[in-house]
């Protein structure tokens, strides 16, 4: 059996995870001849906040129905396609994917490594669509970024058939302590309100980037702000400009984006945003 997934996705740099990353944008072309060939369908076309049209699910529905006997699971990033595209897609696509998986007897895996624990304004991005996956992958913010730690969550039905495996570094006590402390903060009153405040500031501060020549799109969801350029940026040059102005921002390809820590101050967030906009204005004048 194989995994099905959508294009423009990114799921990490370990061997099998690379096989479900987009073969073009996933940064793993060097391994393309050796990775397992998985089943890809188009990425969602309708953006978050757009007018929904069920035709956006047509290819996924057709593929899963026709190839259900060879598909073990559908894996995707819910709502936000991260390092592969920094795109925000319509929640109805995820809701429809859940329904199709149920119809075809296929497990749904949601990769919440980047989106989990409030990043999109909901505790988990799946909540935007009102669905629960059979398996959920979480990491990054589970420890607040202090220690490497990840977890795989499963429904009772999904867990029932799993062969138990105990990796060497499983349940590291120090990482578990950091995760418990981070989760205590996540469930406090005001945590998600802070994410929405970050969203409000990002929308206001990045608005002027829409007027910069060479900018294709500006989009914000929760504590994620993205400026998409029409052409790839000179990463070395633009990073030098950012550092020279006292901030660290990592652009890639045509994307310059912010995913600040939730504890960032309003002042620091405004500085990050204003430097991003000023640098893009400067480089656009020299093109």
Regions from the PLM with identified roles:
Residues 1-287:
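Conserved N-terminal phosphate-binding loop of PLP-dependent enzymes in the Aspartate aminotransferase
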């Amino acid at each position: 059996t194989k995994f099905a997934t959508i294009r423009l996705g990114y799921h990490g740099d370990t061997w099998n995870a690379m096989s479900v990353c987009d073969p073009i944008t996933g940064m793993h072309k060097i391994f393309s001849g050796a990775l397992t060939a998985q089943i890809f369908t188009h990425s969602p076309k309708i953006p978050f906040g757009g007018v929904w049209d069920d035709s956006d699910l047509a290819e996924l529905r057709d593929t899963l129905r026709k190839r259900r006997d060879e598909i073990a699971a559908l894996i995707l990033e819910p709502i936000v396609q991260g390092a592969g595209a920094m795109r925000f897609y319509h929640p109805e696509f995820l809701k429809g994917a859940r329904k199709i998986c149920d119809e075809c007897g296929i497990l749904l895996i949601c990769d919440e490594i980047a989106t989990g624990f409030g990043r999109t304004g909901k505790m988990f991005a799946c909540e935007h669509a009102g669905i629960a996956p059979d398996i959920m992958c979480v990491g990054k913010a589970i420890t607040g970024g202090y220690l490497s730690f990840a977890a795989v969550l499963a429904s009772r039905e999904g867990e029932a058939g799993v062969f138990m495996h105990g990796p060497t570094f499983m349940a590291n006590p120090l990482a578990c302590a950091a995760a418990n402390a981070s989760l205590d903060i996540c469930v406090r009153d005001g945590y998600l309100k802070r994410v929405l405040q970050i969203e409000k500031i990002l929308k206001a501060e990045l608005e002027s980037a829409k007027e910069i020549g060479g900018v294709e799109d500006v989009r914000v969801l929760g504590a994620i702000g993205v400026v998409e350029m029409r052409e790839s940026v000179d990463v070395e040059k633009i990073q030098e400009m950012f550092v020279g102005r006292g901030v660290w921002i990592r652009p890639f390809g045509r994307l310059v984006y912010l995913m600040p820590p939730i504890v960032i101050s309003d002042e620091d967030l405004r500085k990050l945003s204003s430097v991003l906009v000023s640098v893009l204005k400067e480089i656009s004048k020299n093109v």
